[in-house]
Amino acid sequence: MNKLASLIKSSGYADRVLTDQQLGRILGGSDDRRYGQVKRALQSGALLRVKRGHYVLADEFRKNPVHPYALAQVLVVGSYVSMETALAFHGWIPEAVFTTVSVTPGRKSKEMDHPDFGRFAFIPLALHRSGFLAGVQRHVVSDQAMLVASPLRALMDLVAYRKQKWEGIAWVQNNMRIDQTHLVQIQAKGFSALRGVYMHKSASGFLYGLEKAVRDLKASQRALRNEASS
Protein backbone atom coordinates (compact mmCIF):
# COMPACT_ATOMS: atom_id res chain seq x y z
CA MET A 1 0.00 0.00 0.00
CA ASN A 2 1.17 3.53 -0.76
CA LYS A 3 2.71 5.08 2.39
CA LEU A 4 0.55 8.19 2.22
CA ALA A 5 -2.61 6.10 1.74
CA SER A 6 -1.63 3.99 4.74
CA LEU A 7 -1.16 7.08 6.92
CA ILE A 8 -4.50 8.53 5.84
CA LYS A 9 -6.30 5.25 6.55
CA SER A 10 -4.71 4.90 9.99
CA SER A 11 -5.81 8.47 10.79
CA GLY A 12 -9.46 7.61 10.04
CA TYR A 13 -9.71 9.95 7.04
CA ALA A 14 -9.85 7.36 4.25
CA ASP A 15 -13.42 8.20 3.18
CA ARG A 16 -13.17 11.97 3.46
CA VAL A 17 -12.26 14.79 1.13
CA LEU A 18 -8.90 16.04 2.39
CA THR A 19 -7.50 19.55 2.19
CA ASP A 20 -3.83 20.51 2.04
CA GLN A 21 -4.07 21.55 5.69
CA GLN A 22 -5.47 18.19 6.78
CA LEU A 23 -2.82 16.33 4.82
CA GLY A 24 -0.21 18.49 6.50
CA ARG A 25 -1.45 17.49 9.95
CA ILE A 26 -1.58 13.80 9.00
CA LEU A 27 1.82 13.64 7.31
CA GLY A 28 3.82 16.08 9.43
CA GLY A 29 7.35 17.04 8.45
CA SER A 30 8.48 19.87 6.23
CA ASP A 31 6.46 21.42 3.40
CA ASP A 32 8.88 20.00 0.82
CA ARG A 33 8.55 16.50 2.26
CA ARG A 34 4.75 16.67 2.25
CA TYR A 35 4.73 18.03 -1.29
CA GLY A 36 6.88 15.12 -2.42
CA GLN A 37 4.63 12.54 -0.76
CA VAL A 38 1.49 14.06 -2.27
CA LYS A 39 3.09 14.29 -5.72
CA ARG A 40 4.14 10.63 -5.63
CA ALA A 41 0.69 9.53 -4.44
CA LEU A 42 -0.96 11.49 -7.26
CA GLN A 43 1.40 9.98 -9.83
CA SER A 44 0.74 6.44 -8.56
CA GLY A 45 -3.04 6.97 -8.55
CA ALA A 46 -3.35 6.34 -4.81
CA LEU A 47 -4.49 9.94 -4.32
CA LEU A 48 -6.86 11.81 -6.66
CA ARG A 49 -7.18 15.58 -6.93
CA VAL A 50 -10.78 16.83 -6.72
CA LYS A 51 -9.74 20.44 -7.25
CA ARG A 52 -6.82 22.58 -6.17
CA GLY A 53 -6.03 21.83 -2.54
CA HIS A 54 -8.65 19.05 -2.19
CA TYR A 55 -8.01 15.32 -2.56
CA VAL A 56 -9.55 11.89 -2.03
CA LEU A 57 -8.04 8.45 -1.77
CA ALA A 58 -8.57 6.11 -4.72
CA ASP A 59 -11.50 3.71 -4.28
CA GLU A 60 -9.20 0.75 -3.58
CA PHE A 61 -8.15 2.40 -0.31
CA ARG A 62 -11.63 3.50 0.75
CA LYS A 63 -14.46 1.70 2.50
CA ASN A 64 -16.95 3.13 -0.02
CA PRO A 65 -16.44 4.54 -3.54
CA VAL A 66 -16.42 8.31 -3.90
CA HIS A 67 -19.95 9.61 -4.50
CA PRO A 68 -20.19 12.34 -7.16
CA TYR A 69 -22.98 14.17 -5.29
CA ALA A 70 -20.71 14.67 -2.28
CA LEU A 71 -17.91 15.86 -4.56
CA ALA A 72 -20.20 18.36 -6.28
CA GLN A 73 -20.50 20.29 -3.03
CA VAL A 74 -16.71 20.36 -2.72
CA LEU A 75 -16.27 21.56 -6.30
CA VAL A 76 -18.72 24.44 -5.72
CA VAL A 77 -19.28 25.20 -2.06
CA GLY A 78 -22.89 25.98 -1.17
CA SER A 79 -24.38 24.12 -4.15
CA TYR A 80 -26.96 21.33 -3.96
CA VAL A 81 -27.86 18.52 -6.37
CA SER A 82 -31.08 19.19 -8.28
CA MET A 83 -33.04 18.98 -11.55
CA GLU A 84 -32.84 15.69 -13.49
CA THR A 85 -30.07 14.38 -11.26
CA ALA A 86 -32.16 14.71 -8.11
CA LEU A 87 -35.30 13.41 -9.83
CA ALA A 88 -33.37 10.29 -10.87
CA PHE A 89 -31.94 9.96 -7.34
CA HIS A 90 -35.49 9.87 -5.94
CA GLY A 91 -36.66 7.45 -8.64
CA TRP A 92 -39.09 9.93 -10.18
CA ILE A 93 -37.85 9.67 -13.76
CA PRO A 94 -36.90 6.46 -15.59
CA GLU A 95 -33.92 7.80 -17.53
CA ALA A 96 -30.34 7.41 -16.37
CA VAL A 97 -28.61 10.75 -15.80
CA PHE A 98 -24.89 10.93 -16.52
CA THR A 99 -24.21 14.52 -15.44
CA THR A 100 -24.35 15.61 -11.80
CA VAL A 101 -26.42 18.79 -12.04
CA SER A 102 -26.40 21.22 -9.14
CA VAL A 103 -27.86 24.63 -8.39
CA THR A 104 -25.21 27.11 -7.34
CA PRO A 105 -25.57 30.24 -5.21
CA GLY A 106 -23.23 32.04 -7.62
CA ARG A 107 -24.17 33.95 -10.75
CA LYS A 108 -22.24 32.04 -13.39
CA SER A 109 -22.88 28.63 -14.90
CA LYS A 110 -20.00 26.19 -14.77
CA GLU A 111 -19.44 22.83 -16.41
CA MET A 112 -16.53 20.51 -15.86
CA ASP A 113 -15.45 17.08 -17.00
CA HIS A 114 -13.41 15.51 -14.24
CA PRO A 115 -11.08 12.76 -15.50
CA ASP A 116 -11.86 10.53 -12.51
CA PHE A 117 -15.37 11.49 -11.36
CA GLY A 118 -17.34 12.39 -14.49
CA ARG A 119 -19.26 15.41 -15.67
CA PHE A 120 -20.61 18.15 -13.40
CA ALA A 121 -22.83 21.14 -14.19
CA PHE A 122 -23.52 24.06 -11.85
CA ILE A 123 -26.44 26.32 -12.71
CA PRO A 124 -27.53 29.60 -11.10
CA LEU A 125 -31.24 30.39 -10.82
CA ALA A 126 -33.21 33.55 -10.10
CA LEU A 127 -34.07 32.76 -6.47
CA HIS A 128 -34.78 34.78 -3.39
CA ARG A 129 -31.81 34.25 -1.11
CA SER A 130 -33.93 33.37 1.91
CA GLY A 131 -35.42 30.41 0.03
CA PHE A 132 -32.25 29.03 -1.53
CA LEU A 133 -32.30 25.81 0.51
CA ALA A 134 -36.09 25.44 0.81
CA GLY A 135 -37.01 21.86 -0.02
CA VAL A 136 -33.37 20.76 0.04
CA GLN A 137 -32.51 17.82 2.27
CA ARG A 138 -29.31 16.38 3.67
CA HIS A 139 -28.74 12.74 2.71
CA VAL A 140 -26.01 10.35 3.75
CA VAL A 141 -25.08 7.73 1.14
CA SER A 142 -22.24 5.30 1.82
CA ASP A 143 -21.16 7.44 4.80
CA GLN A 144 -20.93 10.55 2.58
CA ALA A 145 -23.09 13.60 3.24
CA MET A 146 -24.72 15.50 0.40
CA LEU A 147 -27.43 18.10 -0.15
CA VAL A 148 -30.13 16.96 -2.59
CA ALA A 149 -33.30 18.75 -3.65
CA SER A 150 -36.61 17.09 -2.83
CA PRO A 151 -38.47 15.79 -5.90
CA LEU A 152 -40.75 18.85 -5.98
CA ARG A 153 -37.85 21.27 -5.56
CA ALA A 154 -35.87 19.46 -8.26
CA LEU A 155 -38.81 19.66 -10.66
CA MET A 156 -39.42 23.33 -9.91
CA ASP A 157 -35.74 24.18 -10.33
CA LEU A 158 -35.87 22.57 -13.76
CA VAL A 159 -39.04 24.51 -14.58
CA ALA A 160 -37.37 27.76 -13.49
CA TYR A 161 -34.23 26.99 -15.50
CA ARG A 162 -36.22 26.24 -18.66
CA LYS A 163 -38.64 29.13 -18.01
CA GLN A 164 -41.43 26.62 -18.55
CA LYS A 165 -44.97 27.97 -18.21
CA TRP A 166 -47.80 25.91 -16.78
CA GLU A 167 -49.46 23.93 -19.58
CA GLY A 168 -51.30 21.40 -17.47
CA ILE A 169 -50.37 18.19 -15.71
CA ALA A 170 -49.83 16.44 -19.07
CA TRP A 171 -46.52 18.28 -19.51
CA VAL A 172 -45.22 16.85 -16.23
CA GLN A 173 -46.42 13.34 -17.00
CA ASN A 174 -45.51 13.20 -20.70
CA ASN A 175 -42.50 15.49 -21.13
CA MET A 176 -40.87 14.71 -17.78
CA ARG A 177 -42.30 11.16 -17.61
CA ILE A 178 -43.24 11.57 -13.97
CA ASP A 179 -45.96 9.14 -12.94
CA GLN A 180 -48.98 10.39 -11.02
CA THR A 181 -48.21 7.88 -8.26
CA HIS A 182 -45.25 10.12 -7.44
CA LEU A 183 -47.17 13.37 -7.85
CA VAL A 184 -49.86 12.43 -5.33
CA GLN A 185 -47.13 11.88 -2.74
CA ILE A 186 -46.40 15.61 -2.65
CA GLN A 187 -47.80 17.10 0.53
CA ALA A 188 -49.30 20.56 0.91
CA LYS A 189 -46.38 21.67 3.08
CA GLY A 190 -44.03 20.88 0.19
CA PHE A 191 -45.78 23.44 -1.98
CA SER A 192 -45.97 25.94 0.88
CA ALA A 193 -42.20 25.72 1.41
CA LEU A 194 -41.53 26.80 -2.18
CA ARG A 195 -43.87 29.78 -2.34
CA GLY A 196 -41.81 32.91 -2.67
CA VAL A 197 -38.62 31.04 -3.63
CA TYR A 198 -38.60 31.85 -7.36
CA MET A 199 -38.27 35.38 -8.69
CA HIS A 200 -39.90 34.77 -12.07
CA LYS A 201 -43.69 34.79 -12.28
CA SER A 202 -43.75 31.85 -14.69
CA ALA A 203 -42.20 29.56 -12.05
CA SER A 204 -44.60 30.77 -9.37
CA GLY A 205 -47.49 30.25 -11.77
CA PHE A 206 -46.29 26.73 -12.55
CA LEU A 207 -46.10 25.93 -8.84
CA TYR A 208 -49.66 27.19 -8.33
CA GLY A 209 -50.96 25.18 -11.30
CA LEU A 210 -49.17 22.03 -10.19
CA GLU A 211 -50.49 22.32 -6.64
CA LYS A 212 -54.07 22.58 -7.91
CA ALA A 213 -53.56 19.66 -10.32
CA VAL A 214 -52.16 17.47 -7.53
CA ARG A 215 -55.15 18.34 -5.32
CA ASP A 216 -57.46 17.32 -8.16
CA LEU A 217 -55.58 14.03 -8.64
CA LYS A 218 -55.89 13.23 -4.95
CA ALA A 219 -59.59 14.10 -4.98
CA SER A 220 -60.16 11.82 -7.98
CA GLN A 221 -58.36 8.96 -6.24
CA ARG A 222 -60.45 9.43 -3.09
CA ALA A 223 -63.64 9.44 -5.14
CA LEU A 224 -62.62 6.21 -6.88
CA ARG A 225 -61.81 4.54 -3.57
CA ASN A 226 -65.13 5.63 -2.07
CA GLU A 227 -66.98 4.37 -5.14
CA ALA A 228 -65.19 1.02 -4.96
CA SER A 229 -65.97 0.58 -1.27
CA SER A 230 -69.66 1.51 -1.54
Identify the function of each model-found stretch.
Residues 20, 83, 151-152:
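Structural motif detector for alpha-helix initiation sites
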Residues 44, 49-58, 66-132:
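Short gly/ser-rich loop at a beta-strand->alpha-helix junction or flexible surface loop bordering the NTP-binding
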Residues 28, 91, 160-164:
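Hydrophobic/aromatic-lined pockets within catalytic cores
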Residues 134-230:
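Hydrophobic alpha-helical interaction segments
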Residues 29, 123-142:
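Short, structured interface segments that constitute the first stable element of a domain
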Residues 1-78:
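Short beta-edge/loop segments at beta->alpha junctions of small alpha/beta modules
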Residues 39, 111-113, 145-148:
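A general structural signal for short secondary-structure junctions and capping/turn motifs
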